[in-house]
C-alpha cells in the first residue's frame, strides 16, 4: 500500500513539473507570430539587460531596451558568435518623452529639455535562435507584437531582410552594454 501511495505521489510530482516547464516560449493559448510561430516568452521582464538604445527617425524617437535569456546573455558576455540555439532576445520599444519633473529640477544649471524618459509602449520584438527550425532566416525566428497581438504576415516577412545587413553579427543589431 505504501508503495502505491509513493508511486502516485511521484507520478503527480513529475506531471506537475512537466506542466510548469512545458511552455518554453509562452502559454499555448497565447498568440504566436505568423511564419515563425514565436510567442511572448514567460518571465522576459526578469531577464538580464543586454543593451539600451535610442532610435531617431523621421517618424520620431524611441528608447529601446534589449533583454536576453541566460543563454543569450552568456553569449553576449563571452562575445560568442554565432549565438547558440536556445538564445532569446527581446527588444522593448517606447516613445521618448521629455520629463517635465526632471527638467524642473535641472532647469537652473541645465535650462531646457535635458531629461527624457520612456513614454508609451510602441512594440516588442523577439528573436529566438533555433538553427534547425529556422534555417532559411539565419537560424532565427522573429516576432513583432503590439500589446499582446502579433503583427501580420506582411510585417513578419520584413524581419529577416531587415536583419540581413547584420549577418557578420549573427543578424543581431544590439551591442552588449557591459
Which ranges hold each PLM region?
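N-terminal post-signal-peptidase region of extra-cytosolic proteins
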Residues: 63-79, 109-110
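Bacterial N-terminal signal peptides
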Residues: 8-21
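Sequence context surrounding c-type heme c attachment/ligation sites in exported
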Residues: 26, 30-33, 37-61, 80-178
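Positively charged n-region of N-terminal signal peptides that target proteins for export
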Residues: 1-5
